[in-house]
């Protein structure tokens, strides 16, 4: 019996075979690109070890920072700090940016720029300032702007001893040319830390880690690749970046228990979409070098807001940007005719404050020996010119970020800028400072595994929650009008809180130059440390108390972690229960406090621990209450109490 013929296999056509070969080659090429470039540079997706909990940022780092990048001398730092103090701006931290050393990075202060560095910086510490120094991971053979521009001996010493990764492999970067310190070499670290101790011994509080770590690389033949040999073996760019942040942070903590590093989170999301710093070293983060303008495509404030919110989605907690941007010149159309008219017609709105100059120098005859003042733009020379409304709106946005970083290129002496800039930036600088108890409490919660301080929302361009109780919709263009998408719930406009707005809803309204689109949740309990009258919630006398803003609705509570006891986490919990009467309960740590309670009507009685409190014309004395009918606020001031249980009645 004959076998049936086996069907012949259909022979593939030559176009198919060519396409298949091309497909295989493409897959191989993609795999090579991924394993040789993408994986060692980004670490994606094998980087879960970088996504741990954020460290506990100390409260001082949440207060206002100041710096400049045009002069960089002791005399100019003094002028900045003395001027900000004279005009009553809150400044806790001064950032010393490059160049400050003899060469990059020997950590030796250039005494031409800082004639008596130890005396100067110890003196700043004695005045209550925190001091942070700029640095990178580079050991340079050539430096562009330091006192010693040729430093081959410095580089060769490190290379010959094996202190540099890749046997001293050098790259060009924006400050010169050098090699990478080897964070895996114990002897290299001993030498490196010895250099750093020159300033750490004076009480330095942190490093600004600039972004040379992302340049870590080597060569395969003539091909530049994102990996190189270190003391312990091969190291990728991504691994080097993690060592850079972690080592500098951890060693700093051995010298100062409140040490921080200022390090990038995102800086244009396509450069490192996984984030520059590992989360577990990200005490304070910023988003790189933005320009003094509005638009995203120009790397203006829209770019900063976008990068900050994307950083928050990655889990970074304390994030910010250079107020007004880092560099560049504002575009001619950044200040339109309507805004220019508002700036030109600005009338002072500041309350009288003791020991603060009553008049901006731009409105008076120029003081002897001082530079004439511009009433339109700042007096920065060259191309780093900042439009006034850019400075104002950026400062307002930064108020509702964890990191308020006022500095960069351009005129930063606000008393030499316009009157509205001086008054509005001062007002919002104080508002940010007064919100530190609220921010710090959320930072503690994030450190313990909770959500970040800033929480981007899906609805509304650039909308985010700032902690549990504030909705922020930043102004990102030269317009007074903004449409805000309110989430579900009830909300009040923070700068005029009379009206309750029901969400979800879209609200369109004008926001004057000295206000910002911020809404507070009905039911919010907000701790603040009021120290000045600029924000309208107290004055200098309030500094002895913790001020609590209460917007009663149903049951709500807030746990305050006291900044002044850091790193010990002492807390006070305030519970609010509203109905026919209002009950407020304090528990745990006792502290003098002022309650500012939204109330449509004046109460008939106020008691604490079953004891009736007297009404006063104004709550200037302890153990009394007053009612501000204009603002519909009940104000209670208490220094001592037994249990801290209030009962407020309207019958």
Predicted regions and their residues:
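Catalytic-domain carbohydrate-binding cleft regions of carbohydrate-active enzymes
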Residues: 39-514
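Juxtamembrane low-complexity tails/linkers enriched in Ser/Thr-Pro and polybasic
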Residues: 2-12
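N-terminal Sec-pathway targeting helices
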Residues: 10-29
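Non-catalytic C-terminal accessory modules of carbohydrate-active enzymes
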Residues: 351-354, 408-624, 628-633, 640-643
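Hydrophobic alpha-helical membrane-insertion segments, chiefly the h-region
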Residues: 28-39
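Low-complexity, intrinsically disordered segments enriched in Ser/Thr together with acidic residues
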Residues: 644-645, 649-651
